[in-house]
From Swiss-Prot:
Effect of residue 100 to V: Large reduction in stability
Organism: Rattus norvegicus (Rat)
InterPro entries, alphabetized: Calycin, FABP2, Fatty_acid-bd, ILBP, Lipocln_cytosolic_FA-bd_dom
Record protein name field: Fatty acid-binding protein, intestinal
Expression induction or repression: By peptide YY.
Disulfide bonds: none
């Protein structure tokens, strides 16, 4: 499938502002912007496995399209929600457990790049990954 493969973060757009809006402190924002995140994505039908490895943690996230699941961000923020496929995009709609506010994440492929767009409280950020 299109998302399958290993993707290494190449650059960010407005990511620190996004993290600030999320309430992440300045030290964690600086570190988070340079986390060397790598995603290894495997799709089997409607089931996805995403291995996240960074300077801070290594975790496996397993989800099925349309099925609610819980997820914790690297800073400990807890979310619940679902991923769905909308055309050629993976769209994640999540709610923060602590305040009920919505976080939207969209993953799409453009050439040899995976573009991950986040939207929270009107602030949009992108993380662009290159396929290894």
């Amino acid at each position: 499938m299109a998302f399958d493969g290993t993707w290494k973060v190449d650059r960010n757009e407005n990511y620190e502002k996004f993290m600030e809006k999320m309430g992440i402190n300045v030290v964690k924002r600086k570190l988070g912007a340079h986390d060397n995140l790598k995603l290894t994505i495997t799709q089997e039908g409607n089931k996805f496995t995403v291995k996240e490895s960074s300077n801070f943690r290594n975790i496996d996230v397993v989800f099925e399209l349309g099925v609610d699941f819980a997820y914790s961000l690297a800073d400990g923020t807890e979310l619940t929600g679902t991923w769905t496929m909308e055309g050629n995009k993976l769209v994640g709609k999540f709610k923060r457990v602590d305040n009920g506010k919505e976080l939207i994440a969209v993953r799409e492929i453009s050439g040899n790049e995976l573009i991950q767009t986040y939207t929270y409280e009107g602030v949009e950020a992108k993380r662009i990954f290159k396929k290894e």
